[in-house]
């Protein structure tokens, strides 16, 4: 890859991983539309590591509190709001982890296309708009229960389809289940930590067992740029939804989806 491609793809991953607009779609499109070469497995791992570091650092207080309470819940302290949240994050991760392993190859073979991205971008954009407009938005993150967490986890599994958006579909589910915007977003971000970690570990093992050439300077640049852009993105996103809701991202998804359809039919 050229230096321009490295910079663009790393920034795309960072900026889109936590926005409800689908990072996978934005990484697939340059190769499908611009003819760029595939970024390769090692680069995929690098940019996911960057975004993982960003979300862990941004939510470091919450992560520390949840982990501490979760481990202490096995002892005399018993169950607390934070320990329960830890269990809900684990429960919400299971569907995507299982289905990801089972369906990964089939999805990559049949669904990694610009047409699929165009359609899913529009459909799930409209669902996000509906959830934002019609959801009661009264529940906080600590009012989750196991049923809510499992439903959001099942929604996260749907995000394996390119164009869906992991953060978008989990926030949509959270809003439809009555969560307020900040809580739906924060749970979505916390839910990203184990799933991105497992994805990174899976691909790292695949990378180690395979015959892949590794350019460490490229990987380091990918980690740094995706980390910086993801951190800024999380901060800005939480500010935007507080003032404007999900509408800007719905509009973007609709414009992108329609634009892709027009482009593909010309």
UniProtKB/Swiss-Prot annotation:
The chain crosses the membrane at residues 1-21, 39-59, 83-103, 113-133, 141-161, 189-209, 218-238, 244-264. GO terms for molecular function: undecaprenyl-diphosphatase activity. It catalyses: di-trans,octa-cis-undecaprenyl diphosphate + H2O = di-trans,octa-cis-undecaprenyl phosphate + phosphate + H(+). Pfam families: BacA. Its EC number is 3.6.1.27. InterPro entries: UppP (IPR003824). It is a multi-pass membrane protein. It is found in: Cell inner membrane. It comes from the Bacteria. Keywords: Antibiotic resistance, Cell inner membrane, Cell membrane, Cell shape, Cell wall biogenesis/degradation, Hydrolase, Membrane, Peptidoglycan synthesis, Transmembrane, Transmembrane helix. GO terms for cellular component: plasma membrane. GO terms for biological process: cell wall organization; peptidoglycan biosynthetic process; regulation of cell shape; response to antibiotic. Its main location: membrane. Belongs to the UppP family. Catalyzes the dephosphorylation of undecaprenyl diphosphate (UPP). Confers resistance to bacitracin. Bacitracin is thought to be involved in the inhibition of peptidoglycan synthesis by sequestering undecaprenyl diphosphate, thereby reducing the pool of lipid carrier available. This is Undecaprenyl-diphosphatase 1. It comes from Pseudoalteromonas translucida (strain TAC 125). The lineage of its organism: Bacteria, Pseudomonadati, Pseudomonadota, Gammaproteobacteria, Alteromonadales. The gene is uppP1.
């Amino acid at each position: 890859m050229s230096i321009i491609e490295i910079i663009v793809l790393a920034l795309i991953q960072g900026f889109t991983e936590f926005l409800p607009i689908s990072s996978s779609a934005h990484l697939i499109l340059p190769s499908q539309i611009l003819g760029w070469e595939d970024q390769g497995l090692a680069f995929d791992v690098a940019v996911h590591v960057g975004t993982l570091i960003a979300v862990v650092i941004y939510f470091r207080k919450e992560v520390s509190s949840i982990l501490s309470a979760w481990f202490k819940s096995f002892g005399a302290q018993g169950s607390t709001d934070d320990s329960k949240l830890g269990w809900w994050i684990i429960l919400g991760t299971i569907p995507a982890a299982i289905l990801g392993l089972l369906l990964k190859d089939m999805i990559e073979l049949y669904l990694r296309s610009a047409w699929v991205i165009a359609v899913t971008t529009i459909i799930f954009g409209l669902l996000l708009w509906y959830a934002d407009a019609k959801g009661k938005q009264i529940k906080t993150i600590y009012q989750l229960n196991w049923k809510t967490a499992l439903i959001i986890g099942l929604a996260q599994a749907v995000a394996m389809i390119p164009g869906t958006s992991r953060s978008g579909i989990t926030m949509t589910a959270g809003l439809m289940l009555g969560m307020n915007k900040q809580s739906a977003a924060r749970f979505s971000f916390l839910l990203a930590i184990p799933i991105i970690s497992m994805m990174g570990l899976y691909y790292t093992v695949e990378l180690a067992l395979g015959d892949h050439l590794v350019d460490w300077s490229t990987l380091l640049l990918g980690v740094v740029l995706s980390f910086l852009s993801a951190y800024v993105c999380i901060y800005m996103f939480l500010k935007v939804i507080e003032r404007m809701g999900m509408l800007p991202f719905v509009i973007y998804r609709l414009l992108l989806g329609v634009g892709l359809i027009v482009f593909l039919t010309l």
